[in-house]
């Protein structure tokens, strides 16, 4: 597994699932999880560790309103983290600070 994908809620799946086809097309292994940095932070942290043990090389955090999910991921790994803003909130401006 090369890419660990995190989404903050089920409503993010419709948007992020478009990336799955691209990853499949290039033969990139991935696993996605729907976990909230606000509601389930311990589960996010545990999943990061689990995915690194499975060989994750990069993480993607996609959530609406703010970049907290990507920030939590980045705080708990030395691997690259890509943050994807999904509307709402500050229009993704909080990602600039990561």
How should each PLM-predicted stretch be described?
Residues 47-89:
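Glycine-rich phosphate-binding loop
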Residues 1-31, 36-37:
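Glycine-rich phosphate/diphosphate-binding loop of Rossmann-like nucleotide-binding domains
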Residues 12-16, 41-42, 63-72, 90-94:
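Short glycine/serine/threonine-rich phosphate/pyrophosphate-binding segments
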Residues 96-98:
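Conserved small/polar residues in nucleotide/adenosyl-binding loops
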Residues 32-52:
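N-terminal beta-loop-helix "entrance" segment that forms/cooperates
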Residues 18-19, 23, 42-47, 81, ...:
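Generic alpha-helix signal with a bias toward terminal, lower-confidence helices
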């Amino acid at each position: 597994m090369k890419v660990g994908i995190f989404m903050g809620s089920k409503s993010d799946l419709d948007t992020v699932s478009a990336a799955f086809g691209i990853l499949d097309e290039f033969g990139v292994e991935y696993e996605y999880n729907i976990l909230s940095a606000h509601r389930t932070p311990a589960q996010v942290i545990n999943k990061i560790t689990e995915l690194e043990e499975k060989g994750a090389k990069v993480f993607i955090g996609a959530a609406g309103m703010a970049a907290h999910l990507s920030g939590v991921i980045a705080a708990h790994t030395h691997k690259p983290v890509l943050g994807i803003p999904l509307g709402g909130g500050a229009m993704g401006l909080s990602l600039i600070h990561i």
